[in-house]
Structures are given as structure tokens and as C-alpha cells.
Amino acid sequence: MYAAMVLCVDDNVGRLQACLDELGISDNTLVVFLSDNGGPIANGSWNGQLRGNKGSLWEGGIRVPFALKWPGVIPAKKMNHTFVSSVDLLPTFAAVSGADQFGPVASDGMDLMPLLQGEPGEYRDRAFFWRRGDMKNVAVRYRNYKYIMNRRTNEEYLFDLHKDISERDNMA
């Protein structure tokens, strides 16, 4: 079933691209593709070397694919390993469209366009936070370090994700 879902997404992304081409707007359209979470265990999903799954605070639950395409604006076939978040989408879309970003409302997100175009930025110097809906588990990532606390058991975990992407060597 999972393979069929992936094939369906692939087919429909192709249909979307064909439609943009047919309308003559593919060169003036920012296409964004990302997932909301890692794969669930219930259907046999495998997150490779990443520990955890959908709904967990391990990398297998929160690290997702994120791809963008905008011919002539974002260089093609480039991989960027800077850690970003979906909260960066609103400020990015506002900047791209020229819209007044939020009025009186602030955002934790950052405009990704300078990063996507290869300009230096301060993207590495911010912390990212996650929690489970029940607040029993919380996590924070700063640069290459990630801390997780299970508030039910008071277990703490600290990982250097550059050296241990599988989150096996607890340094806490």
C-alpha cells in the first residue's frame, strides 16, 4: 500500500508540473514539496538509519524530505543540509510574493530565499523545539545537538547528530 501511495504522489507531482508547463507558468512558480512527519510503524514503514517513527521526537519522526523548485531563481540539483522548519514557509512565501508579512503578528520562521540562493545567513544559530501533544515528551535542537526529555520517566537524551544520526549514543 505504501508503494502505491508513493507512486500516486509521484504521478500527481508530474501532472502538476505538466499543468504548469502547459499554462506557461512553470518558470514563474515556486513548487514546494515536503512531508509532515516520518513514516508510521503500523504499515511497516522504514526510516532507514533514523531512529523512531511518525509521532515520535526521534529523527525518524521529525526529519522529513523538503524539496523546492523555481527555475532561474533557486539553483537546480543542489542539496543543502541546513536544518530548517515548516514554520519558515510563511515568511518565505511572504517575501517571495512581496506581501506584508504578518502585520501585528510575529513569526518564529525565517525567509529561506537567501539560503536557497546560496547567500550566507544565520540559519544555524537558532533552536528548534518539538513536543508531543500530551507534553510528556519534549525536544530541542541547537546546531548539531539534540536534547529529548521524557517527562513521564524523567529520562534525558543528548545526541550529536553530526556524529550519531541514528541517536544511539546518549551523551546525557
Where are these regions (language model features)?
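Soluble non-cytosolic domains of exported or imported proteins
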Residues: 3-10, 83-84, 106
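Non-transmembrane alpha-helical segments in soluble domains
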Residues: 3, 10-13, 17, 21, ...
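Glycine- and acidic
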Residues: 1-2, 75
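C-terminal cap/loop subdomain of S1 sulfatases and analogous C-terminal strand-loop tails that border
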Residues: 39-45, 49-59, 74-78, 82-161, ...
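Short glycine- and hydrophobic/aromatic-rich loop-to-beta-strand nucleating segment
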Residues: 66-68
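Metal-dependent active-site segment of extracytoplasmic phospho-/sulfohydrolases and closely related
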Residues: 7-45
